[in-house]
């Protein structure tokens, strides 16, 4: 990036910071701040150990310096501006989850598709936070990173003093990688009527036993119930009976009688509903506990891809992490680091809603062809001298494929 381009970007960012609504963290004087400046480019030198005593001081600094990247600590410190970490005196830290396309298997290369995939993972994580962990919406701050993902900040006092090992355990739970499916399928002694109707399970010896799905109404148990019933519906939707339940047929205790009973359960009026809403598995299928656990174990990869949440473990485990500040700009894209209400996520489109610059025409010199979707437009930019809207110019320059203004010995705009 040449000096003229640097000056242009700084002026654009300064214009933003003049009126931007910056999401300053609570306990502002206890937060460390860090910055990367365009003047240091192409080196990404981080300037850290900075603190601010008041909102006005922080906002004046952002406007005056117009940094490329802005971070604050997720931790609270007694002395946030101390030069050595062991001198800061750690007081606690928010629980952070980072979802980024870099950490998703088989993430698409197309930026729009990549962001859509990350959004799906983010919605899954939101379900864990609200349902499994029971956090209130007031405890959760959701932020689009301005790049390729989202950040969750959990600010509940219950999590502030968690250490790295406890935070890693949370990541393990989210991933589901330590699940033992035998836990969910239990044979319990029963007292009461057989079949439908109310029952009380007392664990009394020598009573009849039945198979039930533990935790069917919440958490991983709910996900197991949904996966199992969806599988049964999909298999019974096949045209030929011989093609149904191929995974189960590989089990030595599954024969035609078992397959027939599974088909009857699926096609009955309340069979699948009883699994989802009551955890009922007492359908007269011999060895159902063993068969169900076998199927889930064989389907582990697909099950976890569908329901597990892929978060960046080092970020969550780090109790002294720096993270992007809501309302700032991402220096690698020029897009807004945007705070969202949880209800806004599903309809949020970063390629429109996080683009802050306008339509003013700007001349740039493009070093290689580049395609991107911004503001509802498919932009295909050819190499050479081009005139594009300012929002596209900022994005292309931040991505490193363009310089501001004309360059000699370049082809004219097409």
Swiss-Prot record:
A single MF term (Gene Ontology): metal ion binding
Lineage top rank: taxon: Archaea
Single GO BP term: DNA replication, synthesis of primer
Coiled-coil residues: none
Active site per database record: 98, 100, 312
Cofactor: Mg(2+); Mn(2+)
Keywords from the UniProt entry: DNA replication, DNA-directed RNA polymerase, Magnesium, Manganese, Metal-binding, Nucleotidyltransferase, Primosome, Transcription, Transferase
One GO location term (cellular component): DNA-directed RNA polymerase complex
EC number(s) reported in the record: 2.7.7.-
Function, in words: Catalytic subunit of DNA primase, an RNA polymerase that catalyzes the synthesis of short RNA molecules used as primers for DNA polymerase during DNA replication. The small subunit contains the primase catalytic core and has DNA synthesis activity on its own. Binding to the large subunit stabilizes and modulates the activity, increasing the rate of DNA synthesis while decreasing the length of the DNA fragments, and conferring RNA synthesis capability. The DNA polymerase activity may enable DNA primase to also catalyze primer extension after primer synthesis. May also play a role in DNA repair.
Family per record: Belongs to the eukaryotic-type primase small subunit family.
NCBIfam families from the UniProt entry: primase_sml
Subunit structure: Heterodimer of a small subunit (PriS) and a large subunit (PriL).
Entry protein name: DNA primase small subunit PriS
Organism: Methanosarcina mazei (strain ATCC BAA-159 / DSM 3647 / Goe1 / Go1 / JCM 11833 / OCM 88) (Methanosarcina frisia)
